[in-house]
Amino acid sequence: MSKNVVVIGTQWGDEGKGKIVDWLTDHARAVVRFQGGHNAGHTLWVNGKKTVVRLVPSGILRPDVECFIGNGVVLSPEALLKEIDELEAAGVNASARLKIAEGCPLILPYHIALDQAREAAKGDAKIGTTGRGIGPCYEDKVARRALKVIDLFDPARFETKLKENVDYYNFLLTNLFKAEPVSYEAILADTMKMAERIKPMVADVSRTLYDLDKAGTPILFEGAQGTLLDIDHGTYPYVTSSNCVAGAAAPGAGVPPQMLNYVLGIVKGYATRVGSGPFPTEQENEIGAFLAKRGNEFGSVTGRPRRCGWFDAAALKRSIQINGVSGLCVMKLDVMDGLEEIKLCTGYMLDGQKVDILPFGSDAVTKCEPVYETLPGWTGTTVGVKRWEDLPANAQAYLKRIEEVCGAPVDIVSTGPDREETIVLRHPFGL
């Protein structure tokens, strides 16, 4: 039996999961997306060349790696084919190596229309969604009206279900939001055309992964977004529409939980958040501006600037607890080079009481006042460092303090965007 690894974000997303998934596929022979949609991009740098993937797993740049989209992913046919075309134009043989689960719900134009109409109607109270139809598609799944990938193989059933859904969504769009209706005929024609390209990629992903595991093939499960955006465990309602935690890999890919052997928690050396919602350690000052500029903190899909702040160890403790994190990978350590001092949030004052872990819900998190430790920064560079002993002493001390406060080992340190700019203390695949 193989040793399989789940990679998850432990903050509010944007931790740098794409680079590490790409790096880990030097050993993994299969990579699986198990939740989310094309609302988050994973940025890969190989030999100085940038590639952003949104739906296709980050292992696609390795020609000997099989890639899978599990049933927990909501799939936009248009976004998928656009991404495949971009990859293949760059010389990556994507479609031949990608398998899509039959149970993936389809994101269609009415989901996008409703998503955007809702956000516009909320004004200043908006959640900050990407407007790509992710939430409404998950709503359809729970309401048992979703059109799924398997429906593409039965045109008559697809037409019937599509007509019902278009009527339902147009009622909402025109009556509740005074928005333009969507065209049933256009959606049907466009989707059926795209279906001819998608159907050859459809497979029994659950059974295929089970067989690969039995054959001893190392599998990597690639999470999207981050634990603090999880629909159940995040700062609700300022969350995404899916479960972003390690446990979601089992239902989202159709595998038993016993197949998940090691959980790698990805965390930046500082904290960022996109969109609305509480952020206790946010720095709306020169420190935040420094981190944003040095870290190039802009969304890879949306282009939205990210809010920046100090490392929140109390929030990380919550993520470690929920995910059962085996080891941490600290990203973007090099961004902090040159800071005279670094603050580390070890807990909060909440209603006059000291708490050492992130509380539940956005109301409580909004009231949290961070309690900081101040550590000395470092003047030496960490850029491109590949050995622990070559890190500045204060950088080593910072990472060790994170381990002590959070209770999980730092197994990997990233010192730059490229694959090779990585320090490995313990390999997730046991190498």
From Swiss-Prot:
Subunit-structure text: Homodimer.
Gene: purA2
Keywords, comma-separated and alphabetical: Cytoplasm, GTP-binding, Ligase, Magnesium, Metal-binding, Nucleotide-binding, Purine biosynthesis
Record carries keyword RNA-binding: no
PROSITE patterns from the UniProt entry: ADENYLOSUCCIN_SYN_1, ADENYLOSUCCIN_SYN_2
Cell compartment(s), UniProt: Cytoplasm
Co-factor(s): Mg(2+)
Originating organism: Chromobacterium violaceum (strain ATCC 12472 / DSM 30191 / JCM 1249 / CCUG 213 / NBRC 12614 / NCIMB 9131 / NCTC 9757 / MK)
Pfam families, per database record: Adenylsucc_synt
Official protein name in the record: Adenylosuccinate synthetase 2
Family that this chain belongs to: Belongs to the adenylosuccinate synthetase family.
